[in-house]
C-alpha cells in the first residue's frame, strides 16, 4: 500500500475479487441448480471508463484489464464456492457492465457506483434480463495519500454489493433453476 501513496499520477491495479461469505451463503441456500458463466462485456460511456481515474492516478482491473471481466470473475468465484458452478449447465449467466465509477475527491467520504445488465439464458432462451446497481460509501480524506489507497481497497466491496442485489432478486434465482 505504501507504494500506492508515492505513485500519484501512476497506474495501480485493483485488488483481486474476494468472494462475499453472505453472497455465497445466499447462493447455497437458494435451491438445487447449477449454472455456468458466459461472457461479460462493457458498454463504454460516461461513468464507465477503463481504467478508473482516482485523483490523477488510474486503477486497472486485474482481470484482462477489463472491469466487465472483474464482474464475470466475481460471479464465477461465488458460484464455485456455493457449489453451483458447472461448465455443462443449461443455465448461463452473462452480462454488460453499464456504469463503474469510484469518486475519491470528497473531503471525508468516498463513493462508488456500479450498474450492470444481467442475463440468464437456457438453451438460447432468455429467462432473465434485468439491470442491477449498487452504491457504496466509505470514510475518506482530503489527503490523496489516504483517499486513493482507500478507494482502491473499497472496490471489491462495491462489486459484492452489486452481486448481493442480484442474488436478492427471486426472479434471478428462479431463472437458474
Regions found by a protein language model. Give the residues of each.
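Surface-exposed short loop/turn segments
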Residues: 11-22, 81-129, 133-149
